[in-house]
Amino acid sequence: MPGMSTLRIGTRGSELALAQTHQAIAALKAANPGLECSITIISTAGDQRTDIPLHMVNSATNTGDKGVFIAAIEEALAAGEIDCAVHSLKDMPGVLDSRFELAAVLPREEIQDVLVMKADANEDKLVIATGSVRRSHMVHTYWGGKATTVPVRGNVATRLRKLVENPEVSATLLARAGLNRLGYDRDSFEVEGTQVRIIGLPVREFPPALGQGAIALECRKDDALAAEMISRVNHLPTYRCISCERAFLNLLQADCSVPVGGYAEINADDSITLNVVHYSDATHFTRLSETGTDPEAVAVALHATLIRA
């Protein structure tokens, strides 16, 4: 099959999205010698509607079941304006539109959430900014009466700026993967002259969003050439884990706005374990795990247990 000279890649325009896209391009070029890549920046509903909570953006923008950070990029993919879309996997709904396929995932970064806290904050009386329903529920479970939450929207840089500019807020919650990719891979740093420190949260007690830490590369199902080239960068251990996590999301008919956290991990015997915390409301949750050899079968079994719980 003759090669493709230039792969047109669509992505969001945030600093993190572009960092992830450049990481994907480096992998694609290494796996496909001679390949050139171009970047098309696409503004999504999630980027445009920062005036409302994230879980309300779907209904406000008529994006339906599609992820608010991917629908516009998929439209460009369907129209043939781009050949490949690069996403944060956690932003993707459990089921893709039948016109597209998840051609590859890059090796997964650290999956945990972290608390980014002002250095002088009172740890016994935290005010934590988050736009995530999942994180908000988990704050109350993890810290109890020592923490309250306030809403915030925006990319990593915006949330860090809002943290240091608001004297009433003592901390915010972010994915460690995103901070690492932006160069904040240390225990403390300055934001506009204010010292902040990073506290990693244990994944069993404060589980991440399903799919967190993984970068996804999506293409059209009918584009065999792009799919072949992209598949060369696929990291199979990560793909097994995210396949299990996404199968569970599909069974829940959930997306990134649903209050469920968890992660899959591959064991020494090559079996896979899916660990999940599902919130029915802010104070009631179910913690479950399931182990097996087939990622989708593990997800089905855990979902059946959740239904019976």
Where do the model's predicted regions map?
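Structural motif
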Residues: D83-C84, E101, V114, L126-V127, ...
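Short, well-ordered beta-strand segments
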Residues: R8-G10, A85, A103, A129, ...
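Short, structured active-site "lid" loops
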Residues: I52-D83
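A conserved helix-loop-strand patch within extracytoplasmic ligand-binding domains
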Residues: L89-A147
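Ordered, amphipathic secondary-structure segments that act as subunit-interaction surfaces
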Residues: A78-M92, Q212, A216, R220-D223
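Small-molecule-sensing regulatory modules
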Residues: P2-I52, M56-T63, S136-M138, Y142-A309
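Alpha-to-beta junction loops
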Residues: I73, A78-H87, N166-A177
